[in-house]
Amino acid sequence: MSLNFPLLLVIAVAVCGLLALLDLVFFAPRRRSAIASYQGSVSQPDAVVIEKLNKEPLLVEYGKSFFPVLFIVLVLRSFLVEPFQIPSGSMKPTLDVGDFILVNKFSYGIRLPVIDKKVIEVGDPQRGDVMVFRYPSDPNVNYIKRVVGLPGDVVRYTSDKRLFINGESVAEKLLGAEPNTLGSAELYQEKLGAVEHEIRKEMSRYRAMPDGQWKVPAGHYFMMGDNRDNSNDSRYWDDPNIPKDLLGMVPDENIVGKAFAVWMSWPEPKLSHLPNFSRVGLIK
């Protein structure tokens, strides 16, 4: 069972906030009253006794201490920026296994934590954006891919690995063989909308499926990995519980945010590597 960290964070903030509120309206007045009664009953109040009477319950003390920290984390993570780690090579060469990235949570609208309901419109995904989203077949799993098809687009990917959007071939330019692959993989520069980025194709690997064509419904997006022959993306998703016309599509409510930067890398296996900052930079 996957850990629902946003839900746990909201619960932690709520519990700590409740403890702080209870102290404000109930425990603190009782402490002040006890101190006043004690001071009125003796001619020379003992500072040690006053300190003991004014001591907060341990649970309240922890709650009040953690509340501001957890609240700030909740606001930052839910509405501004959230960190993620790249678990696979499906976005090579743009992102590699072990990259730690930052995701802008407000680029595509302000959403409430846990329920992910959009409450403030800000903007929509654009073709070429690198986007984190919840996998349609298992919303507890986050995926990261590049936005290829927008609502209303017709996307076609051919058996010879060419991409077409609305009948027009997407521009790409061969950059050369990928280093350390003995020529088995090539890198291309592709332009999606206003975004120029690199993609990877394996020359020795043939697609197991024929030409595919998809019509992107309203409120949905078609996603592909930059590592075109090693990416579980909109081209391949299949789920009997999802209507046929929505197979491969990411609904707007599943959007997490826009990936915009790599801030650290820690290659696998982590026990034999150290974190490094060689790949730090903005994501194209």
Swiss-Prot record:
Coiled coil: none annotated. Pfam families: Peptidase_S26. GO terms for biological process: signal peptide processing. InterPro entries: LexA/Signal_pep-like_sf, Pept_S26A_signal_pept_1, Pept_S26A_signal_pept_1_CS, Pept_S26A_signal_pept_1_Lys-AS, Pept_S26A_signal_pept_1_Ser-AS, Peptidase_S26. Residues 78-284 are periplasmic. Gene3D superfamilies: Umud Fragment, subunit A. Its main location: membrane. GO terms for molecular function: serine-type endopeptidase activity. The chain crosses the membrane at residues 4-22, 59-77. It is a multi-pass membrane protein. GO terms for cellular component: plasma membrane. The active site is at 90, 145. It comes from the Bacteria. Residues 23-58 are cytoplasmic. Its EC number is 3.4.21.89. Keywords: Cell inner membrane, Cell membrane, Hydrolase, Membrane, Protease, Transmembrane, Transmembrane helix. It is found in: Cell inner membrane. Belongs to the peptidase S26 family. This is Signal peptidase I. It comes from Pseudomonas fluorescens. The lineage of its organism: Bacteria, Pseudomonadati, Pseudomonadota, Gammaproteobacteria, Pseudomonadales.
